[in-house]
């Protein structure tokens, strides 16, 4: 039963709106509460491995629980754990010893896994998740004596590790399931877990399982994954149709997202637009307004289906059909020209990505603002909407820079991957049609400087800087004083 849909209207609003920045002084006890505790992570995929590495480096005792068949067959999860010198054992042997069990298995496996875990978990232990989908959308009941918490890093597992190694971290949402906090210790344990990942350096929001799920699904389906995937494919095809060398076009798109979104990470949409000439800024502003109008209905449909539970229902139906749609969409993406083009060795400077990617800048501006606006309209607090529409964006772009869409879809969850493909099915035809409106200088070449009046430029600058996502962004980025620049690919 969908837990969110079982709540009354007031309870839904209270949970959607729950979001408060945890001030740095609240982390004075670091992760001491978890020292000398047995922490067992279930599953050793991208999130499982990289969270475990961070926690161990923070002084915690971490081991892994895998299925007996996984250990016997020495599968990828077993290999991930053992190569990094973690202790691995079966559920029945290791779960009864755990004080904190962190379930990082894929969403589609969690009902079966959580049922099994509850058979072995000792009394008054803690069960952790890094995504609230199972609790909110599946609604499985958890044993009354078990405390249920969440620490949800706002990025793929690979970036959880990379940011930690830089001495920084990634923002996380933490929450305690209101049906399962018998000892009233959930918040302190979640806070310590977040600290061990390095999230205290980047920003920790005290949220709810519901707010995390609904905002996370919206962000990943639209601007974070769906829009980047859609735009990569359509912009690549457009560049090739304009006569650009296919391999150069591939590099411009693949590495362009990373270079452009790095500016967003440090200074929001304002800094991204400031990297353009004044003529290009005005043109990007105009294009982004048109893109917002064009994509508005599609973005709202995704939000509506997420809130109603329709998205989850359809995805679960696909799980029960052996991922028929998911597998078809994966195959389609793998066969695209963008994914198959060769590596280009021609040097492209950082500024050239901006100069030749004016349309890409406009797409990012439109997608960030639209997803943020619709989340806030729905009742999600601005802080949550910011992380899900803007801050996580460069972290996703980093994955595309490594191995294009293959890498992005590999490291994000199956739930994010399904939602991204679903969005692209409708978004690609829209963006292809929009390409007919492009002018020289919008994509693949630098726009010629034109005369403009100061009044127009001043108004555009004011509009960009005073959008609500920019206002909350300035506040939250003050928390991220130790944020490190990425080494561009």
Swiss-Prot record:
NCBIfam families: ilvC, PRK05225.1. It catalyses: (2R)-2,3-dihydroxy-3-methylbutanoate + NADP(+) = (2S)-2-acetolactate + NADPH + H(+); (2R,3R)-2,3-dihydroxy-3-methylpentanoate + NADP(+) = (S)-2-ethyl-2-hydroxy-3-oxobutanoate + NADPH + H(+). HAMAP family: IlvC (MF_00435). Involved in the biosynthesis of branched-chain amino acids (BCAA). Catalyzes an alkyl-migration followed by a ketol-acid reduction of (S)-2-acetolactate (S2AL) to yield (R)-2,3-dihydroxy-isovalerate. In the isomerase reaction, S2AL is rearranged via a Mg-dependent methyl migration to produce 3-hydroxy-3-methyl-2-ketobutyrate (HMKB). In the reductase reaction, this 2-ketoacid undergoes a metal-dependent reduction by NADPH to yield (R)-2,3-dihydroxy-isovalerate. Residues 208-343, 344-483 form the KARI C-terminal knotted domain. Belongs to the ketol-acid reductoisomerase family. The keyword Repeat applies. One of its GO terms (molecular function) is magnesium ion binding. This is Ketol-acid reductoisomerase (NADP(+)). NADP(+) binds at residues 44-47, 67, 77, 107-109, 157.
């Amino acid at each position: 039963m969908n837990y969110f849909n079982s709540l009354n209207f007031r309870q839904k609003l209270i949970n959607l709106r729950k979001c408060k920045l945890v001030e740095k002084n609240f982390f004075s006890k670091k992760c001491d509460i978890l020292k000398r505790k047995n922490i067992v992570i279930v599953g050793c995929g991208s999130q499982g491995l990289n969270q475990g590495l961070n926690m161990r480096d923070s002084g915690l005792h971490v081991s892994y629980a895998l299925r007996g068949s996984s250990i016997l067959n020495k599968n990828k999860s077993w290999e991930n754990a053992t190569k990094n010198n973690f202790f691995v054992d079966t559920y029945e042997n290791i779960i009864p010893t755990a004080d904190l069990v962190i379930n990082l298995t894929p969403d589609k496996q969690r009902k079966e896994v959580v049922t099994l875990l509850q058979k072995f978990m000792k009394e008054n232990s803690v069960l952790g998740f890094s995504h609230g989908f199972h609790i909110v959308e599946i609604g499985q009941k958890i044993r009354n004596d078990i405390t249920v918490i969440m620490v949800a890093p706002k990025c793929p597992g690979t970036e959880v590790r990379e940011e930690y190694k830089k001495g920084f971290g990634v923002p996380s949402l933490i929450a305690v399931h209101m049906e399962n906090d018998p000892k009233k210790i959930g918040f302190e344990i979640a806070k310590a877990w977040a600290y061990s990942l390095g999230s205290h350096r980047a920003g920790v929001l005290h949220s709810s399982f519901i707010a995390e799920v609904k905002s996370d699904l919206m962000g990943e389906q639209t601007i974070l994954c769906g829009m980047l995937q859609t735009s990569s494919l359509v912009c690549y095809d457009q560049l090739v149709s304009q006569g650009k060398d296919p391999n150069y076009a591939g590099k411009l798109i693949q590495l362009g997202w990373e270079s452009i979104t790095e500016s967003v990470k440090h200074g929001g949409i304002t800094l991204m637009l400031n990297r353009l000439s004044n003529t290009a800024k005005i043109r990007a502003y105009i294009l982004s307004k048109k893109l917002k109008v064009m994509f508005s209905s599609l973005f709202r449909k995704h939000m509506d289906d997420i809130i109603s539970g329709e998205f989850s229902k359809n995805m679960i139906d696909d799980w029960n059909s052996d991922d028929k749609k998911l597998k078809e969409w994966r195959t389609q993406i793998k066969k695209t020209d963008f994914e198959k083009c060769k590596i280009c060795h021609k040097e492209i400077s950082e500024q050239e990505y901006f100069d030749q990617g004016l349309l890409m800048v406009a797409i990012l501006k439109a997608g960030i603002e639209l997803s943020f606006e619709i989340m806030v309209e729905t009742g999600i607090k601005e802080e949550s909407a910011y992380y899900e529409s803007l801050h996580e964006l460069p972290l996703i772009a980093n994955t595309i820079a490594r191995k294009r869409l293959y890498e992005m879809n590999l490291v994000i969850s199956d739930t994010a991957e399904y939602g991204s493909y679903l969005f692209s099915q409708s978004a690609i035809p829209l963006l292809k049609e929009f390409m007919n409106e492009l002018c020289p200088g919008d994509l693949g070449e630098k726009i010629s400087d034109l005369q403009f009046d100061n009044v127009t430029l001043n108004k555009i600058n004011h509009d960009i800087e005073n959008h609500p996502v920019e206002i909350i962004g300035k506040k939250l980025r003050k928390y991220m004083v130790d944020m490190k620049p990425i080494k561009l690919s």
